[in-house]
UniProtKB/Swiss-Prot annotation:
Family to which this protein belongs: Belongs to the Rv1128c/1148c/1588c/1702c/1945/3466 family.
SMART domains: HNHc (SM00507)
Chain positions covered by the region annotation Disordered: 422-454
Coiled coil: none
Tree of life domain: Bacteria
Lineage of origin: Bacteria, Bacillati, Actinomycetota, Actinomycetes, Mycobacteriales
Protein name: Uncharacterized protein Rv1792c/MT1741/Mb1728c
Length: 454
């Protein structure tokens, strides 16, 4: 089924490039309308088949490589090499695991987990949206549905997918799920598999969408908290002194014009703020669990622009000023990008140094990594064994996987003259990729810089 020769594999893709180049030169001028539709149908069939060609390569990388060889976890490595999003890379990895070829521990070939869906994809009958519907259907089936029934249902949906649009297939899958589980029986394993809370990206107005599924216990907990803090008159930001405990006054209740959704938002914010202020969360990466905000004195004085939190959230200056009114402040002093008077002779970074790194790096400094500061570790650019001091100018932030690459993965870190950290890959991973991370510093992309000057 698959070419085992390196030369055959390269030749096959060369032939594919050649054939596609010929297709790109085809003009529709001499074709009738039915013929144009037929050509588009053939294009769609080819597009649907291409993922089946990717699955064996992805599965090999997943099974036979490690982070050191890839330069990071597989989703990150694919996203960087293919210039796709991390989410898309993860989707392809999971799809390949379900639809791609497998092998036993002794190397014997096995059919794909979703045999019928894989065959329909290889034939060009199913597109990515069809496959997503089928995979979600199987993922959401309750635990008590046996394997033969699952396989029969999967085969039925794979056949229907070749005749219906994805939105129509979704409706058919919903009806089939009701037939297989008419009583709606789900156990703790089924519910635990679906639990999730997803925070969307910030929009132009700074707002973030939230979605997901709460377990019954989580729902009961949220209900109890909101019953108190989301009641009319409670935690109302429009009040001069919002009521956060006890019973709000009748005047506060009558003056509350918020919708139920707005009260839920404000009640949840009040609960989370109280948890942070309680100190019960302890420390996170060497600092008390808290909102860490970095901004400039100019922006504070002008009351314009945005500040950045350690989690990568942009805060309007009005929010920053309100938070700062009851916070401890830390002055960051620097000279042309280099920090002053922040070093000591201990190996571990001090709390002050960690705070400065939040403002300086804003997140993992590995090229194109988007892990925010809250989720990073402190890395010595020059190994502590060599310098015997922890100087802020020789520290940088790195997420766990990338910090490990610098420790045991053969990557070299160094500081440029402007204080930016460079990550130099080992030879087998060097394909001309960036050496520095501009993700958290988009302003650097707006002016020329000397990338090669260490």
């Amino acid at each position: 089924m698959y070419s085992s020769s390196r030369e055959e594999a390269v030749a096959a893709f060369d032939n594919l490039d050649t054939a596609l180049n010929r297709v790109l030169k085809v003009s529709p001028d001499d074709l009738t309308i039915p013929e144009c539709l037929a050509m588009l149908q053939r294009c769609e069939k080819i597009r649907r088949r291409l993922p089946a060609a990717e699955h064996p390569f992805i599965n090999k990388l997943a099974d036979q490589t490690d982070q050191t060889e890839l330069g990071g976890k597989l989703p990150f490595a694919l996203a960087e090499r293919l210039h796709i999003s991390r989410g898309e890379a993860s989707r392809r990895i999971h799809e390949a695991a379900d639809l791609g070829p497998r092998r036993t521990l002794t190397g014997q070939p096995l059919p794909p987990l979703l045999t019928a869906t894989a065959a329909a994809q290889r034939a060009g009958h199913l597109g990515p949206a069809h496959v997503q519907v089928i995979r979600c259907f199987l993922h959401q089936l309750p635990h008590h549905v046996d394997l033969p029934t699952r396989e029969k249902a999967e085969a039925e949906l794979a056949t229907l997918g070749g005749r219906f649009r994805p939105d129509q297939l979704h409706k058919l899958a919903t009806k089939l799920a009701d037939c297989l589980n008419p009583d709606g029986n789900y156990n703790d394993t089924d519910r635990a598999r679906r639990r999730s809370i997803i925070l969307g990206n910030q929009g132009p107005d700074g707002m973030s969408a939230i979605s997901g599924y709460l377990t019954p216990e989580a729902r009961a907990t949220v209900d109890a908290v909101l019953a108190k803090l989301a009641a009319p008159g409670m935690a109302n930001p429009a009040d001069d002194t919002p009521c956060l405990a006890g019973t709000p006054s009748q005047a506060a209740i009558e003056a509350d014009t918020r919708s139920a959704g707005q009260r839920h938002h404000d009640g949840l914010l009040a609960a989370l703020r109280a948890l942070l202020c309680s100190g019960e969360l302890g420390q996170h990466n060497g600092l008390p669990a808290a909102i860490i905000v970095s901004t400039s004195l100019t922006e504070l004085q002008s009351r314009a622009g945005h500040a950045l939190t350690g989690g990568g959230t942009l805060l309007p200056m009005s929010d920053v000023i309100r938070l700062a009114s009851h916070a401890n402040h830390y002055l960051r002093i620097f000279d042309h990008g280099r920090e002053l008077a922040l070093y000591h002779t201990k190996r571990l970074a001090s709390p002050g140094q960690r705070i400065v790194l939040y403002a300086k790096d804003r997140g993992c400094s590995f090229p194109n990594c988007d892990v925010p500061g809250y989720l990073t570790e402190v890395h010595h650019v020059t190994d502590f064994a060599q310098c015997q001091e922890t100087d802020i100018n020789e520290l940088t932030q790195g997420c766990g996987p990338h910090h490990q690459l610098a420790t045991t993965g053969g990557w070299i870190t160094r500081k440029r003259k402007d204080g930016t950290t460079e990550w130099l890959p080992p030879a087998h991973l060097d394909h001309g990729q960036p050496r520095t991370n501009s993700y958290f510093h988009p302003e650097k992309l707006l002016h020329d810089s000397d990338e090669d000057d260490p």
